[in-house]
Structure formats: C-alpha cells, structure tokens
UniProtKB/Swiss-Prot annotation:
Located on the platform of the 30S subunit, it bridges several disparate RNA helices of the 16S rRNA. Forms part of the Shine-Dalgarno cleft in the 70S ribosome. The keyword Ribonucleoprotein applies. GO terms for biological process: translation. GO terms for molecular function: rRNA binding; structural constituent of ribosome. Part of the 30S ribosomal subunit. Interacts with proteins S7 and S18. Binds to IF-3. This is Small ribosomal subunit protein uS11. Belongs to the universal ribosomal protein uS11 family.
Length: 134
C-alpha cells in the first residue's frame, strides 16, 4: 500500500458550540512548575481551560501566583461566555498559585459554592525527590 500524500490543507476542527451551563466544577491543579485551571459542567465535560503557559508565561514565571491568577481569570471569562454562574472548586497540588487562582475565579464574577482539597496523599508510595542543597 503506497504512503498517503501529505497536503497543506488544514482540517477545520470541531466548531465551538455555545453551551448554556449555569453551574459546574472548577479544577485547579497547582504544581511547583505550572498551574492548570479546567472548568467543567456537572457531568465532567470540559467547557474552558487555561494554564500559566497558555496565558503567555514561560519558564520559572509559570509557577508564580500572578500567572495562576491570569490563568484562572482567562478560564473563568471563557466559562462565563457559556453562561456559567456558580462553580464548586477542587484544588490539587502543592503549588504557589492555589489561593490566588480561587480568589481570581471569584473576582471574575463566578459564585463559589464549595472549595475542596483533593491533593492525593501517598500511603508511603513513590520515593520523593531528594532535598535541595542551596
């Protein structure tokens, strides 16, 4: 079977359908290097998302609280375009952008119903990274 010829035509992806969703969930994953904010409906289908890198920060600036704030504002704005009004927040990870992201979701105009910490706790699982000696 001969290989397929490549063309320069771009595929047009799925059209963004404006959903009308009043409440959903906001998942904030804050690591030491980045912060990712995903806003879903109550079934778990992603409506909007943003990360520190997606907003325009590179390198070590992605891990700052300000970058997390910008990512949360961006995701909240996109979700509010779909009619989102109220979210339940689930926070995961040890990063520095946790509280800032929650505050900026509220400042963007989303009503926060509840805040849950869903950081996974090991029952002595993987060995952690070695301590830094600076």
């Amino acid at each position: 079977m001969p290989p397929k010829a490549r063309t320069n035509a771009r595929r047009t992806g799925r059209r963004v359908v404006k959903k009308n969703v009043a409440n959903g969930n906001a998942y904030i994953k804050s690591t030491f290097n980045n912060t990712i904010v995903s806003i879903t409906d109550t079934n778990g289908a992603v409506i909007s998302w943003a990360s520190s890198g997606h907003v325009g920060f590179k390198g070590s600036r992605k891990s700052t609280p300000f970058a997390a704030q910008m990512a949360a504002e961006n995701a909240a704005r996109k979700a509010m375009d779909h009619g989102m009004k109220k979210v339940d927040v689930f926070v995961k990870g040890p990063g520095s952008g946790r509280e800032t992201a929650i505050r900026s979701l509220q400042a963007a105009g989303l009503e926060i119903g509840s805040i849950s910490d869903v950081t996974p706790q090991p029952h002595n699982g993987c060995r952690p990274p070695k301590r830094r000696r600076v």
